[in-house]
Each structure stands twice: as structure tokens, then as C-alpha cells.
Amino acid sequence: MAEKGVKQKGELKTARIPIKIVPVDTPLRKPEWIRVKAGNSAGRFGEIKSMLREKKLHTVCEEAACPNIGECFGRGTATFMILGDICTRRCPFCDVGHGQPLPPNPNEPAELADSVSSLKLQYVVITSVDRDDLRDGGAQHFVDVVRAVREASPKTTIETLVPDFRGRMDIAIDILGNGLPDVLNHNMETVPRLYKQARPGADYAHSLALMKQFKARYPDVKTKSGLMVGLGETDEEILEVMRDLRANDVEMLTIGQYLAPSGHHLPVSRYVHPDTFKMFEEEAKKMGFSGAACAPMVRSSYWADQQAHSAGVA
């Protein structure tokens, strides 16, 4: 058994997943529409990175090797990752490390809230690794962080991007009510046919139920979910997931292109043309989503502030 606090990445992380990754001899060449803006150490990008190091805070932007980190940090926005940087799951599309996490840092809520206030962030996204080792899946820590940010920076709009709280959903939903965000996001990630391959340990119906039950309990909070394309799904399967999301009262949507972090992760099965993303966005509007961001470089938290504004949140 791995030692607590030791992070497994790449091949070590994915060695024990149920459906093994089959490496490709020649990865698909990235098309011209996949373009990433590099970060500049000056200005807001450098300011945010410096404060993250000073406060020993984590962002999913860095831990998951998000391609938009330069643009988002440069705009003065970041997605904070709470509850450590070691995940109890082994999802083979994700670059976050796996292992036995350390106990939650009791100082993290205050330190994160102080950073949000100091950086004068108008919109903050708070996410976490999966914490299957905790009785509540980390729900109370989410509440503590939300409350601390509300107190330190009352005008900041808060989006939480939560895990699935597997095996403890009812407890988690009860607890989350003690510190509600403005937007609750939980990513479906992919289509149900690919769950065992891409999301070992997760369950499609459970994730839908989490969002439906949360919305039923807290109807004033907007609900949101995100999908990736390029894992082996079809366009029709994506549309079917979108229908399922609407049937379970999810109001906001993001769809973006999957990019493999390394050769030890799931390979990209296809690069979806921007016109197809436009089709997804048009269909989302027809289905009644209040906000939909669908484009190759879109990620769950990418321009989340503008999407929330268009949905009447911020």
C-alpha cells in the first residue's frame, strides 16, 4: 500500500485501472484550431502564481495541466483545488496525481479566502480531488471554504465544482446546504458507454442523481456540468447526455476537446471540428440550457464568469 502523501502520476497512476490503456504508435496530429496561449510571468499571471506558492494553495489549472492556464491566470481568474493535490481515483484522462491523501488542511479555508480577497477576484471556482477516504467526501471542507470566501470577499461570485460523493451523496447534499455556492458544477466528463474506461469508480446514473437531488433541495443555485469529446464517443451519444442533463435539471453546460496529458493517459480518438461544437451549442440552446460554452479549448471553468453572467448569475 502506498505511503500517505505520496503522489502517483502517469504510468504508476493508471497501472491498476480496469480497462488498460492501449498506446498508439502514432498519436493524432493536432489540427490548426487547437492553439494554446502561453503564460507570461509578468502581470496577473505571475501575481497569481506567486500567491499560490506563498499560501501553499493548489489550482486545478496547474495540477491537471490545463491548456488555458496562461490565458486564465493572465485574466486574473483561477480554479482553486482544495483538499490537497492527491486524488483517491485513477481516471486515465486526468493529470492529477493518485494516492492516499493527507488529512485536510484546517487553515486552507482562511488562506484561500485571503488570497481571493487580496487578488480581488470577482468570480472564483473551487474544486477538489476525490476524497473517498473522508466520511462526507469532503463536503464540510467545501462549506468551510465557501463561508470563508463569503466573509472575506462578499462581492465574489462562487462556483463549486464538486466530486460525485460516491456512497455518501445524501450526507454531502445535507452538509452543502450550510454554505451554498452561486453555481454548483459536477462534470459528467463522458458518455455512459465509456465510464468504465474513462471514469473507473464513478457511475453515470449516480452523477445525474447528485445534480437532480441538489437542485431539488436548493432550487436557487444554478447547476452546471461539463463533457469532453475525443475519448471514443459519437456526436449522438453526446447529444443524448445533454438530454439526460436537462431531464435532471442541469442548466449550464460546457463541452471541450480532450487533450491527452501524456502517452500514459487515454489517447485522443478524434479531434472534433469547431463546426460540430457550434452544433452542440445550438442544440443546447434548443434543449433549454441557460448557458452553453462549446468549443475546442473550452474547459469546465474556462470563462466561467462570463457563462454565469449570461445565465443570470453574476
Swiss-Prot record:
Places the protein is found: Cytoplasm
Binding site for [4Fe-4S] cluster 2: C87, C91, C94
Enzyme category, top tier: transferase
Pathway: Protein modification; protein lipoylation via endogenous pathway; protein N(6)-(lipoyl)lysine from octanoyl-[acyl-carrier-protein]: step 2/2
Keywords: 4Fe-4S, Cytoplasm, Iron, Iron-sulfur, Metal-binding, S-adenosyl-L-methionine, Transferase
Protein residues bound to [4Fe-4S] cluster 1: C61, C66, C72, S301
Gene Ontology molecular function terms on file: 4 iron, 4 sulfur cluster binding; lipoate synthase activity; metal ion binding
Protein EC: 2.8.1.8
Pfam families xref list: Radical_SAM
PROSITE patterns tied to this protein: RADICAL_SAM (PS51918)
Cofactor: [4Fe-4S] cluster
Domain of life where this protein originates: Bacteria
GO CC annotations on file: cytoplasm
Iron found in the keyword field: yes
Cofactor note as given: Binds 2 [4Fe-4S] clusters per subunit. One cluster is coordinated with 3 cysteines and an exchangeable S-adenosyl-L-methionine.
SMART domains registered for this protein in UniProt: Elp3 (SM00729)
Family: Belongs to the radical SAM superfamily. Lipoyl synthase family.
Protein name: Lipoyl synthase
